[in-house]
A protein has these predicted regions:
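A structural signal for multi-pass alpha-helical bundles of membrane permease subunits
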Residues: 1-184
Length: 184
């Protein structure tokens, strides 16, 4: 599409800016629109993630530049494939490893999110993720000076979903990581 390179460069530029510099500004924005605290505190955690990040766009663009050649696209067009068919029959199946790798990266990032969860869900412990609950549990157990076995068990239990997800999708995860290696 026209302007694709400018759009891509703007996305790459946003990756150069530190996320911490925008944390407070983002928080103020979400406070002003009423998305902080209670069940609405989940919205700033979910809605921005639906649109991907600059890193995701860069990753997928790099993958598709190397995996989807112009010859394949031209051959599909000659065979009568329209844009929708080209996307669903060729681009999506070719991009499955990269898309699944991005899903895994996003899931692990959201699962391990601590500061954003604490910032937006501070007053509703029923909505906390496992990492916030684990932090509070270890804080409570530290008061008694001991309970190291319980802390380690809680940390291990919090890692189990990620370990199971990794082993279940290891093939796609490794393929997605190897995407950046390039083809010689």
């Amino acid at each position: 599409f026209p302007g694709r390179k400018i759009f891509f460069l703007a996305n790459v530029f946003t990756m150069m800016l530190p996320l911490g510099a925008f944390g407070f500004v983002g928080y103020l924005f979400y406070v002003n629109i009423g998305w902080v605290g209670g069940a609405r505190g989940l919205l700033p955690l979910i809605i921005p993630g639906l649109f991907g990040s600059a890193g995701t766009i860069f990753f997928l663009r790099t993958y598709y530049d190397s995996a989807l050649s112009n010859e394949v696209v031209d051959a599909a067009k000659i065979d009568g494939a329209g844009t929708v068919r080209l996307f669903f029959s060729i681009a999506l199946p070719l991009g499955k490893p990269a898309i699944l790798a991005q899903f895994l990266f996003a899931f692990v990032g959201g699962y391990n999110s601590y500061s954003a969860q604490l910032m937006y869900l501070y007053n509703d412990k029923s909505l906390w993720n496992l990492q916030l609950a684990l932090s509070e549990l270890t804080g409570m157990l530290s008061e008694g000076n001991g309970y190291n076995n319980a802390k380690c068990a809680a940390a291990f239990i919090s890692m189990l979903p990620l370990i199971l997800l990794y082993f279940g999708m290891q093939k796609y995860f490794i393929e997605g990581i190897n995407i950046g290696g390039g083809k010689e």
